[in-house]
């Protein structure tokens, strides 16, 4: 049946009559306002059974009130809504025109749909729509190898034969391989460059090509800004205001399955973009997780895009220079990852991705993004328990059982990392080591155990917080030395008005607000495993200098540390004496 999709922003109407060519039924759609995402509104016909590898021909007549274009595709009519390799752009004008597309689905499905999508404001009409098995695919009229008239293959081409797809991939692969290895030899052999060299981030290029260089690199963003209209439009964008702690693995597992066993691995771009209200979780979580996985480098993208290094406010999606909540936990990130407080996994798992298996994936998908361990049999959630990677050679591995689909608690094989989603939409993440500890997540009235330290909260604005603790120069939290505590919640600029777009989407458009930045003071209590008389608590100023000491109380033989908004700070020094 035909379906017409509109979200709460789209304004569009549709009707069916007999005013098509020669009195045929005509579908007319008038769009007044586009939806919140680029593909909305759209209409589709679902319930189709498609057989993978078999040709189908889609035909229809179309016209519009002005020269316009829209997209068509074949995809699942159900979760996970995957497309089948057919995706084309239809151009229309005021005259009825016939359109014919022959395509071969890359997989079969019993409930597929043909979608007409991305309708911008205007009037569109369709008639004589049909989808039939069969059709001729291959060279277009007038094309031949002898005449050298075969056009460059476009990714959006829908009439590629299997041989054409494979020839095209083989050509791209050899061209790219020659480029990367040629540049590598030039840099190393002719220029005599001594540092290690990589090509580009994995997934921009096949794994085996990039693994021929010195190390593997990858990028990832938790809910990168989306631009429904014009790319990078400063007034038309949104981010999903979601917390990673509610999605076990998330971007972290997505990075883990791109690692190559036996090679150095860096993540040279990572961030949880502003104005996501939970962005403080990002760098501490990847620091702990990356150390557990045994990664070699993690880079924030970015500290600054310009020379205004101390703006005193959040200035953009990615620049962390003015964001207290993302900066104040960096000492803990350094301790967990660089100092090595978080221990590497005890067990490393890998799946073999041979050159032949990689090439088969490229033939099928035309995408290097599909060359990840999870597409070769490794459940990405295993990365929450053990180190994971792709092996360049080898036989299929015997992998341990994956966590149950309904699993809600994940404990690393070192027992130092704990991820809990036992309460709906109230996940939390803990890293617990002898010299550093991290909590980030939703509170819900719970008390959290960080080893022999108990952490409980008062009321916070989001019922969420991030707290990091670092033994700066002592051997642990019950030993003499200085401890650094950072506690953050909601942050925003003055005059920053967050606009709720629905479905978890938020924006501030181009109204980022002004300095100084406003930070929530977290109300929390820590119970340290030392006598209160051995402990001094100092709220710190913005430069990290001690302010007047705050009282420390005794509670059942332990030191009771109280963090409170009255201290007007997000970090504290704790001195543990002999």
Feature annotation, model-predicted:
Residues 334-335, 340-539, 556:
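Long, low-hydrophobicity ectodomains and other hydrophilic envelope-associated domains
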Residues 146-153, 160, 167, 174, ...:
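Glycoside hydrolase catalytic-domain groove-lining segments
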Residues 220, 275-313:
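Substrate-binding cleft of secreted/luminal carbohydrate-active enzymes
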Residues 557-578:
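C-terminal beta-strand-rich structural cap/linker in extracellular carbohydrate-active enzymes
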Residues 1-154:
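Extracellular and organelle-lumenal recognition/adhesion modules and their flexible linkers in secreted
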Residues 71-73, 128, 139-142, 209-210, ...:
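Short, solvent-exposed loop/turn and secondary-structure capping segments
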Residues 59, 98-104, 525-528, 559-564:
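Exposed aromatic-hydrophobic patches
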Residues 60, 187, 216, 290, ...:
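Conserved, mostly hydrophobic/aromatic
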């Amino acid at each position: 049946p035909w379906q017409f999709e509109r979200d709460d922003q789209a304004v569009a109407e549709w009707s069916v009559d007999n005013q098509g060519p020669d009195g045929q039924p005509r579908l007319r759609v008038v769009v007044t306002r586009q939806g919140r995402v680029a593909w909305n509104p759209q209409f589709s016909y679902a319930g189709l059974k498609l057989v993978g590898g078999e040709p189908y021909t889609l035909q229809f007549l179309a016209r519009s009130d002005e020269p316009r274009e829209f997209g068509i595709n074949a995809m699942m009519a159900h979760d996970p809504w995957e497309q089948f390799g057919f995706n084309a752009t239809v151009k229309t004008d005021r005259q009825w025109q016939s359109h014919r597309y022959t395509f071969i689905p890359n997989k079969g499905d019993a409930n597929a749909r043909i979608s007409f999508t991305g309708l911008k404001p205007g009037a569109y009409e369709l008639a004589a729509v049909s989808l039939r098995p069969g059709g001729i695919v291959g060279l277009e009229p007038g094309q031949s190898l002898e005449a050298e008239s075969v056009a460059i293959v476009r990714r959006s081409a829908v009439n590629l034969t299997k041989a054409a797809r494979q020839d095209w991939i083989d050509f791209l692969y050899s061209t790219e391989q020659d480029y990367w290895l040629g540049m590598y030899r030039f840099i190393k052999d002719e220029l005599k460059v001594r540092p290690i060299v990589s090509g580009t981030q994995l997934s921009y290029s096949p794994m085996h090509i990039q693994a021929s260089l010195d190390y593997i690199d990858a990028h990832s963003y938790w809910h990168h800004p989306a631009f429904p209209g014009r790319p990078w439009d400063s007034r038309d964008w949104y981010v999903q205001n979601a917390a990673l702690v509610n999605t076990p693995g998330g971007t972290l597992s997505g990075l883990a399955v791109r690692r190559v066993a036996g090679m150095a691995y860096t993540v040279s771009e990572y961030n949880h973009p502003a104005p996501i209200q939970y962005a403080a979780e990002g760098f501490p979580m990847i620091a702990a997780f990356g150390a557990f996985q045994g990664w070699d480098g993690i880079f924030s993208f970015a500290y600054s895009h310009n020379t205004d290094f101390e703006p005193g406010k959040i200035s953009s999606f990615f620049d962390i220079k003015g964001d207290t909540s993302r900066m104040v936990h960096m000492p803990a990130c350094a301790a967990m990852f660089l100092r090595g407080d978080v221990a590497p996994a005890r067990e490393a798992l890998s799946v073999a991705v041979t050159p032949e298996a990689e090439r088969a994936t490229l033939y099928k998908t035309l995408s290097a993004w599909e060359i990840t361990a999870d597409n070769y049999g490794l459940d990405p959630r295993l990365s929450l328990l053990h180190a994971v990677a792709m092996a360049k050679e080898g036989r299929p591995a015997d992998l341990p059982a994956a966590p149950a689909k309904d699993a809600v608690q994940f404990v690393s094989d070192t027992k130092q990392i704990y991820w809990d989603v036992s309460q709906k939409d109230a996940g939390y993440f803990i890293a617990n080591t002898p010299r550093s500890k991290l909590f980030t997540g939703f509170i819900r009235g719970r008390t959290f155990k960080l080893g022999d330290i108990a952490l409980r909260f008062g009321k916070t604005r989001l019922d969420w917080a991030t707290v990091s603790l670092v033994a700066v120069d002592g051997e642990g939290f019950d030993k003499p030395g200085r401890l650094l505590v950072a506690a953050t919640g909601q942050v925003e600029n003055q005059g920053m008005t967050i606009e709720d777009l629905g479905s978890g989407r938020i924006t501030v458009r181009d109204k980022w607000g002004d300095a100084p930045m406003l930070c929530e003071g977290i109300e929390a209590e820590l119970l340290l495993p030392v006598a209160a008389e051995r402990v001094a608590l100092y709220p710190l100023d913005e430069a990290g200098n001690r302010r007047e000491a705050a009282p420390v109380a005794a509670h059942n033989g332990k030191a009771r540390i109280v963090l409170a908004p009255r201290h007007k700070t997000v970090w504290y020094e704790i001195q543990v004496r002999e």
